[in-house]
Curated annotation (Swiss-Prot):
GO terms for biological process: DNA recombination; double-strand break repair; SOS response. It comes from the Bacteria. SUPFAM superfamilies: P-loop containing nucleoside triphosphate hydrolases. This is DNA repair protein RecN. The gene is recN. ATP binds at residues 29-36.
């Protein structure tokens, strides 16, 4: 629900601030006073209309799914429009793109303009027919849940089958690609850590000649061993330390002779090159081994494709048969309730001085999560596109009222532009009664030209223009009677108009 509206520099409005309560809110005033300017200014904060306002700020206390749009929700969410060179939109001081704001706004605001017919979507009609059945048959809820569960399983298997059919078209090529990778990796047969070990070995090999020459010279020390020991003994010094040192040196010398490196250097280099190829292609030996495992699995999958296809086709046909049977039950149930829905809708259309609508159920070949049914709506054999904008808005109103009546629920904000324009008093009163009923579920904003609708309002705002400046103020009871009388008789208010206004107000 909108609690507060604030705007600045909106054409004739230098500043406007409105405190709003729940129910029906109407804006009245002379032609050209700025009602539409104010109305569009409010809608512009939700990106549902264009406006010249520099600032619009609206407080909404509904729980909204702002997190889906990357906005943190608060108890009171503040929608703000700022216009300088460009128009910018904010919710709770967090920036939001125009299109995202539009999509969000449509989840809790219904704007009855001539541009959209989304009230008459097939899904909405089917949901109402199903709701009528639920009122009589409590088991129908679980039936619908089972149908949707079966349809989701059916869709998943259908997608898997389509994927297999696509694979079959290029399965031989995929097999060859998988075999080629398996053969390449398997022929190299890499081991984890092997590449690093071979690089160390290669480094040692590159120093082999220098090492052999150096140790060949160093071995001459062993020829002096006896001479040194004899000198130590004559000097009465224990020679064991020298013997131990030379023994350790002999071990090092033997190890450095690289007798273990006496193998094919070309083979070593080829091995390093093959392992290097795998590392370049797969980033690591570990990844190459993982790819080998994956490609073996894929090859097995391709070779078992026909078996998988048969199994899926069997499940697909079983589920399709099950869904067809349930869809028939759905169709029969909806046909049974179709006249009841049509009657409810036509009761509201009659109240709105419109001709009866006819609803027909068409059964489609293709099955969906809603079944196979499509509801066709006609007004006195005329298609929706042939209705005037006024008729279309009243039809929308009748449908929303029907929805609230059947579901005993409704939530959000309803904006009605020129809903009672060019109507008789009787027609305006009928619309007023429907809106009064809807205001139990929705917060409603409307521009009103006739006293019948305005008399039913919970909030009545008068828009006036003095010179070039427009102003808006909330009317008290006495001011409302005067404004209703003006709407009846014009600027020269008669006593009869005052009495009529009082009667409207009392009723």
């Amino acid at each position: 629900m909108i609690n507060r509206i604030f705007m600045k520099e909106n054409l004739g409005f230098k500043k406007a601030e409105l405190e709003i309560s729940k129910g029906l809110t109407v804006f009245t005033g002379l032609s050209g006073a700025g009602k539409s300017v104010l109305f569009k200014g409010i809608l512009s904060a939700f990106s549902l209309s264009e406006s010249e306002a520099k600032i619009v700020e609206i407080e909404v206390d509904d729980k909204l799914d702002l997190e889906s749009f990357g906005i943190e929700s608060e108890e009171e969410n503040v929608f703000k429009l700022l216009k300088e060179k460009n128009t910018k939109y904010f919710i709770n001081n967090q920036s939001i793109a125009k299109k995202s704001l539009q999509n969000l706004s449509k989840t809790f605001i219904k704007y009855l303009s001539a541009k959209e017919n989304n009230e008459f979507g097939n899904e909405k009609f089917l949901n109402l027919l199903d709701a009528l059945e639920m009122q009589e048959n409590t088991n129908f809820v679980s039936f619908l849940e089972d149908f949707k569960k079966d349809f989701n399983a059916y869709s998943q298997i259908s997608n898997e089958l389509n994927a297999i059919l696509e694979e079959e078209k290029k399965v031989e090529e995929l097999k060859e690609l998988a075999r080629a990778q398996i053969e390449k990796i398997s022929s190299i047969n890499p081991k984890i850590g092997e590449y690093e070990e071979l690089l160390i070995l290669k480094k040692k090999l590159s120093k082999k000649d220098k090492l052999e020459e150096a140790w060949s010279k160093a071995e001459r020390i062993f020829e002096l061993e006896k001479v040194v020991i004899e000198a130590l003994n004559l000097s009465e010094v224990d020679a064991s330390f020298f013997s131990e040192c030379l023994n350790e040196l002999r071990v090092i010398c033997e190890n450095q002779k690289m007798e273990d490196l006496d193998f094919d250097v070309e083979a070593l280099l080829d091995r390093i090159e093959n392992l290097s190829y795998l590392i370049k292609r797969y980033e690591s030996i570990e990844n190459a081994l993982e790819v080998l495992k994956q490609k073996k699995y894929e090859l097995e999958h391709y070779e078992n494709l026909s078996f998988e296809k048969k199994e899926l086709e069997k499940k697909f046909q079983e589920l399709k048969q099950k869904l067809e049977e349930k869809a028939q039950i759905l169709t029969q149930t909806r046909k049974k309730n179709l006249k009841k829905l049509e009657k409810c809708l036509n009761n509201y259309l009659k109240d709105l001085y419109m001709k009866d609508a006819s609803l027909t159920l068409k059964e489609n070949e293709k099955i969906s999560i809603l079944g196979k049914d499509e509801i066709m709506l006609d007004i006195n054999l005329a298609h929706l596109k042939n209705l005037s904008s006024g008729e279309l808005n009243r039809l929308r109103l009748a449908f929303i009222a029907t929805e609230c009546n059947i579901l005993n629920a409704g939530k959000g904000i309803l904006f009605l532009d020129e809903i009672d324009a060019n109507l008789s008093g009787k027609e305006a009163m009928s619309i007023a009664k429907v809106l009064e009923e809807l205001s139990k579920f929705y917060q409603i904003f409307a521009i009103s030209h006739l006293p019948q609708l305005s008399s039913k309002a919970h909030n009545h705002f008068l828009v006036e223009k003095n010179g070039e400046e427009s102003k808006v103020k909330k009317l008290d009871q006495e001011e409302r009677i005067k404004e209703l009388a003006r709407m009846v008789s014009g600027e020269l208010v008669s006593d009869e108009a005052i009495e009529f206004a009082k009667t409207l107000f009392k009723n």
